[in-house]
Amino acid sequence: IDNQTRVCHATTPPAMNAAFGRGAMTGSWYNLKKAKLIWIEGSNLAECHPLAMKRVMEAKDNGATIVHVDVRYTRTSRVADHFFQLRPGTDIVFLGALINYIIQNKKYDADYLRRNTNAYCLLRDDYKFDAGIFSGYNEKTRTYNKETWGYKVDANGKPVKALSMSEPGTVMDRLATHFSRYTFEKASAITGMPV
């Protein structure tokens, strides 16, 4: 017998630990009702997590905007303020185009990024990402040596931060370079969603 615990939630803690430093939920369902914008992607929350959807609907009643991105129209789509339908397997391209737009048009909170993220940190000069492969890849063993994936560090071993996120070699600079290829036109051609 298969169940949601193994299929869905078993992979969540390792991914969250890698992304956020801990494998537990980063917010509470209760706080969802206080949101101004709720983005639901690749999930039919109304049917898969009805208690979470209850909080989403409370947020909507409080004026929140609900966005649903999925390959199919569902009960979640029906209550969303905006529904974006993608071709299966094209979510990353869609998100890449949004990330590119946000970076190119400076639609981010620079102060938040400075205080709470690694956007200003300088990456090592030997870090590379060429043709979809990170530096340190050993073709023979098909494994990575992740040594080059770190930051430039000072004499105390602490990451060196630039004065500007746009300085060459910062995490934000590399992020902007990587996502620059994800234009709305390219995303539209791949996802099937009009520009």
Predicted feature descriptions by range:
Residues 27-75, 83:
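A conserved hydrophobic secondary-structure block that centers on an alpha-helix together
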Residues 16-19, 56, 82-84, 100:
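Short low-complexity, flexible loop/linker segments enriched in glycine and/or proline
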Residues 19, 40, 190:
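Short glycine/serine/threonine-biased micro-segments
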Residues 26-29, 46, 50-53, 88-92, ...:
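Short, amphipathic alpha-helical segments
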Residues 23-25, 44, 194:
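Gly/Ser/Thr-rich beta-alpha loop segments that engage phosphate groups in nucleotides
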Residues 1-34:
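Anionic-ligand anchoring segments at beta-strand to alpha-helix junctions in alpha/beta enzyme folds, i.e.
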Residues 1, 59, 88-90:
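A short alpha->loop->secondary-structure connector
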Residues 63, 72-195:
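Long, well-ordered, tryptophan-enriched scaffold segments
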